[in-house]
Regions:
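Phosphate/pyrophosphate-binding loops at sites that engage ATP/ADP/AMP, CoA/4′-phosphopantetheine
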Residues: 58-71, 222
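Active-site neighborhood for divalent-cation/phosphate handling
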Residues: 71, 75-171
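N-terminal phosphate-binding loop and adjacent alpha-helix
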Residues: 33-64
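Gly/Thr-rich phosphate-binding beta-strand-loop-beta motif of the actin/hexokinase/Hsp70
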Residues: 1-38, 72-75, 171-212, 216
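Switch/connector loops and helix/strand junctions flanking conserved nucleotide-binding motifs
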Residues: 19, 29, 46-47, 76, ...
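Glycine-rich phosphate-binding loop plus the immediately following alpha-helix
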Residues: 42-46, 142-165, 197-230
Length: 230
């Protein structure tokens, strides 16, 4: 049953779907009240079934955590998201959005009317400014969003796994001044985030746990699912 005071977060990865239910203290600190996760392990040859399996995992989590009718804020895996950092000249704030749209047209590898995109301005460094562009194909986001909604949830904020991880780190360690490297090893990709003095840089590498499983399957001439269980 929906509770307007709780915050539901959903993380949709390639082989794992996780959900957390949070509450806020009087000082706006977040407390994790409940958490559950489901594996979505598929042979790469059955990729067409992934969205259906993700939906089944979401349905299980909704029931287990009793969040039917809640608003879910969710993140999508870095592999499906395009991220680019762009440098901007010193401009009035009124000109920034127009310039960033121009930069998005140059850098995003799809027509802008086919993607959902947004940007965030990073702290200024001298006269130069920098922004991070984030984009995902609209059809991919719509398919995932529809799947989530079909399992007794409505959707709220959407983020990508890379920036979600960075934001979680900054919120958890607000006084940290030393440079840090965050590494998230997923099934299909590995995300690297370098953070220093309020600025961050990201790189997503197309290498993850699924490649290890596939190599084991080939080496021992067994099925992908058997290799995954080893």
């Amino acid at each position: 049953m929906a509770n307007s005071r709780q915050i539901v977060a959903l993380n949709v990865g390639s082989q794992r779907v996780s959900m957390g239910v949070f509450s806020k203290t009087s000082k706006d600190a977040l407390i994790l009240d409940r958490y559950a996760t489901r594996l979505v392990v598929l042979d790469p040859s059955a990729e067409g079934l992934r969205l259906t399996k993700i939906g089944e995992a979401i349905a299980d989590l909704v029931q287990e955590l009793n969040v039917k009718g809640s608003v879910a804020n969710y993140s999508v895996s870095g592999q499906s998201v395009f991220i680019r950092f762009v440098k901007l000249p010193a401009l009035d704030d009124t000109d920034v959005e127009q310039l960033i749209r121009f930069e998005a047209q140059q850098h995003v590898p799809f027509p802008l009317d086919e993607v959902v995109w947004d940007y965030h301005l990073l702290p200024a460094k001298g006269l130069e400014r920098e922004a991070v562009l984030v984009a995902i194909k609209a059809e991919d986001l719509d398919s995932l969003n529809d799947e989530i909604v079909s399992h007794n949830l409505s959707t709220g904020k959407v983020d990508c796994a890379l920036t979600s991880l960075y934001n979680a780190y900054v919120d958890s360690y607000p006084d940290e001044k030393e440079p840090v490297m965050l590494i998230d090893i997923g099934a299909k990709s590995t995300d690297l985030i370098y953070s220093e003095q309020g600025r961050f840089f990201t790189r997503s590498i197309s290498a993850g746990g699924i490649f290890v499983t596939s190599a084991i399957a080939r080496e021992f001439n067994i099925s992908f699912m058997e290799a995954e269980r080893l």
